Structure formats: structure tokens, C-alpha cells
Design a protein with these regions (language model features):
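Surface/interface-facing alpha-helical segments and adjacent flexible terminal/loop regions used
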Residues: 1-184
């Protein structure tokens, strides 16, 4: 049996499930409220305590969001990410962020297809939506946590994907959200 390869100093059995659930939560938080099932819990406190050492209160974040009510969530989401005379005030889709960079959506779809991630027809029109990108990252973490071999391929895929499709534009997204809705 060959040696197992993995990213140095990463205990996959501990970190992959936490990363997996965290990406799933952020995907749900950034999805359009019009697409979410109302009343579905965003997270349970059982696993969110595991990320407290990193200074993140995910249970509080999920509870605060759920406490705002669906109508308010839908109105605020639409005003920030969907409605605008010349497009949305803040682009939550990667291709909108990089209008001068062709092929973003195609590259995303190639990633999805290579790893067997299938978008339902409902979301196929927006493979570059931030919630879909986060859900795919959740999918890669899940595959890493459940893999018996080739763990490194999922870890490196996460690194490559996050570098290409999250790190490069989410800081700009955060700045634009803060400018449009200070303190949100």
C-alpha cells in the first residue's frame, strides 16, 4: 500500500468536516432568499462551537440572519444584488465582477464537471453566483472528508479553486457591500 499524500499539517478528519459545513452555511447565507426554503435551520450549535477557536461565531451569525425574517431578507438581497438601473449595486456573480475577463463561467463549469458536481436546472444559469461557488467548495471539502484515497487531489483542487474563484474577487465584494450598506 502506497504512502498517503496530504497537505502538510492538516488533519483531514478534523478540518474537512468543519470546512465543509462552514462553506455550506456561507453558501446558504449568500443565496437568494427567494431560492431558500423558509424555516430551514441554517446551522446547529453542535458543530459551530468547533470553529470558535478561529474567532468565528457561526451559530450567532446564522441565528442573526434567521431572525431578520424572510421578507426583510428578500427585500435587502434584491436591493443589494439584483435591482439597479445599470445592473445590481453589488455584483454577487463572478462574471459581473470581471466583465473584461472572458471565460469565467466556462472555467467554473469545467471545474464542476471534472469533479462530478451537478448544478440543477434551477441554478444552471448562474454557475458563477457566489453561493454556487461556495457550495462547490463545500462539495470539495465533503469529498476530501469522505475520500479513502486521493485526498491530496481534493485539497489541491480546493486551493486552486479558491485562489481562482474566491480570493481574487471577494475582497472587492466586501468593500462594495460595506460602501452600499455600511455595517452590514
Amino acid at each position: 500500500m502506497g504512502a498517503r499524500r496530504y497537505v502538510r499539517n492538516r488533519d483531514t478528519s478534523l478540518t474537512a468536516p468543519i470546512r465543509c459545513r462552514t462553506y455550506a452555511l456561507f453558501s446558504a447565507l449568500l443565496a437568494s432568499p427567494h431560492d431558500l426554503e423558509t424555516g430551514a435551520p441554517l446551522c446547529d450549535a453542535g458543530w459551530t462551537d468547533e470553529v470558535r477557536p478561529y474567532g468565528i461565531d457561526l451559530a450567532g451569525l446564522g441565528s442573526a440572519y434567521a431572525g431578520t425574517g424572510w421578507r426583510s431578507q428578500a427585500r435587502d438581497y434584491s436591493a443589494l444584488f439584483e435591482v439597479g438601473d445599470s445592473g445590481p449595486p453589488v455584483a454577487i456573480r463572478e462574471q459581473q465582477q470581471f466583465k473584461d475577463l472572458p471565460g469565467v463561467r466556462e472555467e467554473l463549469v469545467r471545474f464542476y464537471e471534472f469533479f462530478g458536481y451537478l448544478l440543477s436546472e434551477r441554478y444552471a444559469w448562474a454557475p458563477d453566483h457566489l453561493s454556487v461557488i461556495l457550495e462547490f467548495t463545500h462539495f470539495l471539502c465533503y469529498r476530501e472528508s469522505s475520500a479513502r484515497r486521493d485526498i491530496l487531489s481534493y485539497q489541491l483542487a480546493q486551493l486552486d479553486f479558491v485562489s481562482r474563484h474566491l480570493i481574487n474577487w471577494t475582497p472587492v465584494l466586501v468593500e462594495r457591500i460595506d460602501a452600499a450598506r455600511p455595517g452590514s
